[in-house]
Amino acid sequence: MIHRLFLMATLLAANLWFSQSCAHAAEALQAPASRDVYEVIERGRLALLADKYQEAIDAIEEALRMPEFLTLESSAQFRVFLLAAFADRGREDYLGAHEYMMLATGFPDANAEHWLMRAQSASRVDAWPDAALAVTTIAKQWPEFIADADERLISRAAFRANEDGKHKAERIELLTALFAAHFVLEGGSQPDGLWHDLVLDALEHHDLRRAREVAGRIQGASTLLHMRADRRFDAVVKAERRTFNLTAAVKRECKRLAKTADANPRSLGVRVQYGYALLDAGRFAELLALTEEIIARVSTARADEAPYDDIEDQLNWIYNHKAAALRALGRWDDALIVMQAARLQPEDGSINVSQAINLGWHYVDYGKPENALEALDGIDWAHSLSAYGRMQLQYVRYRAYLQLANVQEADNVLAYLREHRDDAQDTWQLAMLDAGDFDGAAALLIARLRDPEKRYEALGEVQEYLPLPRLPRQAEALARWEKLVARADVAATIDEVGRREKAPMYDVPD
């Protein structure tokens, strides 16, 4: 979707530039061809103003092919590339839009808004290293702009900047710039996962002072638990015992987010964050009351008087929290009813794929495989799911077919999970346990623990959390997991890279 206000401002600025440029060309008595390039550009600008994107890009690309384009001043060329990016974005040619934004930001006229457009267009085509470069530029040159920028885009760029394993230095440069720019998430929450990685980089460079400085911003008990469990962080954990007191951290985070929610009465996003903190703390009855109050307010509000600004993006997670609280209280049937309602809530403006998969997952926990498969009906496999999401969907199908004793379909799905195991290694690990392949599951868990890039999640999985009510099939799955973790080879690897602790918090599954 094009940002209409920014587009209109760009088009108005281009109109002023065009008028001045034409007058200058006439005064200079240049050849008619000089005026022609301006006329072609203006044709493209007017088409863009009328939302005729194909017509606009045709005119702009015609101008770009004209020899006279190269004689234009750099500021004029900058505006033409910017118009081209808007036109391609309007016709959903995101690769073209990204290429034009890369050209536009090569000019000194480019400001923070233009670099943010480059990051947005890069994210559309999964060019995450370039998105990271754009955000780094903003954070360094316009740090004040970071506070008002799209925090979800910035977070995604920061987390995915080194997905190919070739841009570690550039990612650390980005994290350093974001830390200096005081980047925060909605409601002032810290991006704990980013600071976790920045602390690790400081320790790898034997800079304990810097590690302590960055660790001081980490708020979430879950991130602190992962760091306590990882031997790479021992120096900073020892130096900052107060920060890494998990019992205190759980209470501290609940208190902080309660105040944040009060200070942001129209934000569901901060209430979703608060909900996660309440789950960690085991305050399930409070979370249930909170979610019921929110759902009631939304349900009874008039269409033109929505009580929150982000209902479309966040309400489905409020339903998810309510269901999680009910399960944690052992109210299984009530939780299923809530999850069925959650499936009907839109997710980011489209079909709620996440809740459909979650519903299917819990149906197989309940021993209702037919319902699980039915919950997955209607999901657009090709367009609605990421590679990770497809693994979750297939795992639900695998468990359902196992319960139905449909060996052929179960084997077919297991073959898919095996072939695509790198898309979600944690899910493949669970599938191997379900299949009785403890040796394979152990080998994978050991490999994940020894891999510095995968250790965070693997160590988090092996911690001992406070007990929760479990259905029979959940208890069976937990028994298989404990058998895996108790193996001598797995236990030795855990001790080699970290430790297994009894965490004073809950790990409530979505």
Spell out what each predicted region is.
Residues 49-62, 89-99, 124-137, 162-178, ...:
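Helix-turn-helix repeat elements of alpha-solenoid scaffolds
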Residues 23-28:
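Boundary at the C-terminal end of the N-terminal hydrophobic targeting segment
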Residues 33-42, 73-81, 108-117, 145-158, ...:
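Generic helix N-cap/helix-start motif at coil->alpha-helix transitions
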Residues 8-17:
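Bacterial N-terminal signal peptides
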Residues 358-365, 377-415:
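Alpha-helical adaptor scaffolds
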Residues 202, 425-510:
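Long, ordered, amphipathic alpha-helical scaffolds
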